[in-house]
């Protein structure tokens, strides 16, 4: 399973949801949805905007987490 680390990265940079929404020019509700559910599907174009706003590579925004059934 893929888990988005956007919240972790943003919080480490002292960036809240509202600020990230403005910086990335992404709708606040989209950011909030990602914040609340890091396993949700997100368009690549949205991830590109968020990565640019956070100053990271798009590959830094996610991690692979083993499914519970694989454990």
Residue ranges and their predicted role:
Residues 8, 33, 62-71:
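Short, charged recognition helix plus adjacent turn
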Residues 1-16:
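A short, Lys/Arg-rich alpha-helix, primarily the initiator
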Residues 10, 24, 35, 46, ...:
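DNA major-groove recognition helix of helix-turn-helix
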Residues 10, 21, 51:
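The alpha-helix within a helix-turn-helix
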Residues 15-33:
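Short alpha-helical DNA-recognition segment
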Residues 17, 44-47:
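Helix-turn-helix DNA-binding elements, focusing on the entry/boundary residues of the two helices
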Residues 46-51, 61-62:
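Hydrophobic micro-packing sites on short alpha-helices
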């Amino acid at each position: 399973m893929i888990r988005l680390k956007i919240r972790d990265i943003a919080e480490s940079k002292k960036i809240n949801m509202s600020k990230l929404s403005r910086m990335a020019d992404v709708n606040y509700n989209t950011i909030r949805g990602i914040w609340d559910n890091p396993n949700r599907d997100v368009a690549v174009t949205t991830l590109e905007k968020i990565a640019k706003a956070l100053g990271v590579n798009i590959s830094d925004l996610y991690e692979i987490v083993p499914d519970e059934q694989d454990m």
